[in-house]
Amino acid sequence: MAAAAELSSSSGSERSLEQCSSPLLTREVLCEVFRSLHTLTRQLNLRDDVVKITIDWNRLQSLSASQPALLLTALEQHVLYLQPFLAKLQSLMKENSTATEIRQTEAETKSELRAIHPTEDLQDEGKPKDCDVGDVKKTQNLFDPEVVQIKAGKAEIDRRISAFIERKQAEINENNVREFCNVIDCNQENSCARTDAVFTPYPGFKSHVKVSRVVNTYGPQTRPEGIAGSGHKPTGMLRDCGNQAVEERLQNIEAHLRLQTGGPVPRDIYQRIKKLEDKILELEGISPEYFQSVNFSGKRRKVQPPQQNYSLAELDEKISALKRALLRKSREADSMAAHLP
């Protein structure tokens, strides 16, 4: 019984001692934390006018001690908050050490080159005259890493190139849809902006493709006729309008539009050219690929037989005539069947 009483009394005294020392230990840890802040400012050489931490140690000792669990949680959160900054500083130190090693290697290589080829044998700095090919290649490989603008790996560069191509393709697709298709039916499996095109005129134009008209304020048309044709001898091309440049323009446009050449020439030749050029501009505004298959050459194109080429109006007229003939034959057949007994 006496031994049990002694054990209980000793354990109770130890428990009371721990309870008394726990607030003191917590207060001591808190004081050391604030002292570390003072130490940090001194290590960073920060003056009092930059960072000033004022702590009343007497009042801090007299304050009631905080709970150890609360202090532990606060310190752990603070350490976790500082860990990303530690990682950034470590990576920065590695980069600085790598740059320092590169500069040291460059300096050593330059010193070796100077030792092998003294300055008396060099006419210009950076242009060795008696160096062998290997030393010249070494000097060419030396460069400042700060000059490199794109610091990325091959995979990243390939990703950027593919992203650029995809973005440009998306812009082209969007432009085709905007210019050639008014409404897109997303439920269709097979569709295209060109095949499903709905004629939507471009704002300010008669077509759905933006075109620009060039106005030449100075050119052959503004010059006197005597100056324009004074230095040229008359050739076979001058028999139509009397001006070689104008005749060439007419031939190019007529070949471009596949018009039948010959016939009476209007009196105002420039008005004729203007009408032809306006027609080309209108057709190219409807579709840029309208004349894509036309190949220009220096020679004039041969005129195809008129019976092989038909316009839309001529085709419509032939179709309507064929319908009328078939309708007339069917009526005649019906009338003959009605007269039969």
From Swiss-Prot:
Q: Name one GO molecular function term.
A: identical protein binding
Asked if Chaperone is a keyword of the record, the answer is no
Q: Which GO terms describe its cellular component?
A: ATAC complex; cytosol; mitotic spindle; nucleolus; nucleoplasm; nucleus
Q: Which residues carry this modification: N6-acetyllysine?
A: K299
Q: Where is region (Leucine-zipper 2) located?
A: 312-327
Keywords in UniProt for this one?
Answer: Acetylation, Cytoplasm, Isopeptide bond, Nucleus, Phosphoprotein, Repeat, Ubl conjugation
The annotated crosslink position for Glycyl lysine isopeptide (Lys-Gly) (interchain with G-Cter in SUMO2) is: K94, K127, K137, K151, K233, K299, K302, K323
Chief location: nucleus
Tell me which residues bear Phosphoserine. Answer: S91
What are the BP-aspect GO terms? Answer: negative regulation of transcription by RNA polymerase II; positive regulation of gene expression; positive regulation of JNK cascade; regulation of cell cycle; regulation of cell division; regulation of DNA-templated transcription; regulation of embryonic development; regulation of transcription by RNA polymerase II
Region described as Interaction with MAP3K12: 170-341
Q: Where in the cell is it found?
A: Nucleus; Cytoplasm
Annotated signal sequence is: none
Query: Could you name the domain of life of the organism this protein comes from?
Result: Eukaryota
Oligomer status and interactors? Component of the ADA2A-containing complex (ATAC), composed of KAT14, KAT2A, TADA2L, TADA3L, ZZ3, MBIP, WDR5, YEATS2, CCDC101 and DR1. In the complex, it probably interacts directly with KAT2A, KAT14 and WDR5.
Function as written in the Swiss-Prot or TrEMBL entry: Inhibits the MAP3K12 activity to induce the activation of the JNK/SAPK pathway. Component of the ATAC complex, a complex with histone acetyltransferase activity on histones H3 and H4.
Q: What is this protein called?
A: MAP3K12-binding inhibitory protein 1
Organism per entry: Mus musculus (Mouse)
